[in-house]
Each structure stands twice: as C-alpha cells, then as structure tokens.
C-alpha cells in the first residue's frame, strides 16, 4: 500500500483484522497446520458443510484450529468498517438510510480478501479460496446496489484485474496458482522460496 499512498499523496489506516487471514487448521493427511485456502481438492470437495456460508467452519476440517475464530473476527471487522458508512448488517443485507457513492479502498492479501468477499456476498470462503485466484497487485472491485430504499447488497464488478500491469507492459506473478498440469511439485512458486519458508 505504501507505494500507492506515496504516489497519490494519501494516508491510510491499518486495520489489525485485515491482516492476512490467520486461521489455521490441521491437515488430515500430514497432521501439520495448514491455511484453509491451500487444501487439495479431494480433501474438501466432498464436505457439504464447506459450501454453506453459515456453517462452513463447523465442518470436521475446521473443528480443531483457529479458522472459526478468525472468520468471526473478519465478519465483525468488516461490519464495523461498514458501520462507519452508515451500514448495519441485517441477515445477508445491510440497512443504510443514506447510502452514498463513497469508495472504500482496502489493501490486503488474497486469503482475507476472499473471506471479506464471502461475508459480503453470502458465499462460503472455501469456494472463493479454491475457485478464484487474484495475483499480487491485482484490483478487485465490489459495488453496492440499493434496489429497495435502505436495503444495500454488494456485487462483484471485477476480480483480480491486472490491466494496470498490461498497460505498463509489466509481467504478472503466478504466485497462488498451482500447476496447470501435474509436475510433481505442488506449487508454481519459485523452488528457492521453499528454502525460505514461504510454503
């Protein structure tokens, strides 16, 4: 965020809950702690609860660990942020007596971003974490819709936009992707990152 803030002569507020999603669970194959967006498909796709935004953290994969606590922290943090703009969550929508076309810009990592989007759109983060990829420096845009006075919902306009890199003829990172075809290595990150503890 610093580069953008310096270039645009703006300041920002750091929101502790908006740090990368810190929830961890225990991988049933290895017994090691694992981030929830890094499970192999065969380990989670047969779990119906993981598709349910209201109950996904109750699944056996997350009964041990901190995923549920961090999910609730994320929801509370997002709702508190939106409350500053007059929005109060009610079920899956927000009540707002005076909705404004303000722009809120959040700089964050993939895991927490998808958790926030899941909360706003009513989608289990497991589906977003394992079905979407947003590379570093990409832009994701959500807008509000108020079709009934005082009832606000969110819609994703774009996810992972990299047009600023294309326009500047800059390459994009493949971080966060897994190999398109099997390679024997479960990552597209540079092999030297393994020794640095990035995996």
Regions found by a protein language model. Name each.
Residues 1-58, 199:
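Phosphate-coordination/substrate-recognition cap region in phosphate-metabolizing enzymes
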Residues 21-39, 93-103, 115-199:
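Acidic, low-complexity terminal tails and accessory targeting/binding regions
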Residues 40-73, 182-186:
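Short glycine/proline- and acidic residue-enriched helix-loop micro-motifs
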Residues 60-93:
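Internal catalytic-core helix/loop-beta-alpha segment
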Residues 109:
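Short, conserved phosphate/pyrophosphate- and ester-handling motifs at nucleotide-, phospho-/glycolipid
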């Amino acid at each position: 965020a610093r580069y953008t803030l310096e270039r645009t002569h703006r300041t920002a507020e750091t929101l502790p809950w908006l740090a990368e999603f810190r929830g961890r669970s225990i991988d049933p194959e290895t017994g090691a702690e694992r981030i929830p967006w890094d499970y192999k498909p065969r380990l989670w796709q047969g779990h119906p609860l993981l598709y349910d935004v209201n109950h996904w953290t109750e699944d056996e994969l997350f009964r041990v660990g901190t995923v549920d606590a961090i999910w609730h922290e994320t929801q509370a943090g997002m709702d508190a942020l939106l409350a500053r703009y007059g929005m109060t969550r009610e079920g899956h929508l927000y009540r707002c007596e005076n909705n404004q076309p303000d722009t809120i810009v959040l700089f964050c990592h993939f895991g927490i971003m998808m958790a926030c989007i899941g909360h706003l759109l009513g989608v289990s983060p497991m589906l977003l974490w394992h079905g979407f990829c947003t590379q570093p420096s990409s832009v994701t845009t959500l807008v509000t819709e108020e079709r009934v006075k005082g009832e606000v919902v969110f819609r994703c306009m774009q996810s992972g936009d990299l047009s600023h890199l294309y326009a500047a003829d800059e390459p994009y990172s493949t971080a966060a992707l897994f190999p398109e075809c099997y390679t024997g290595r479960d990552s597209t990150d540079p092999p030297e990152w393994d020794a640095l503890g990035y995996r």
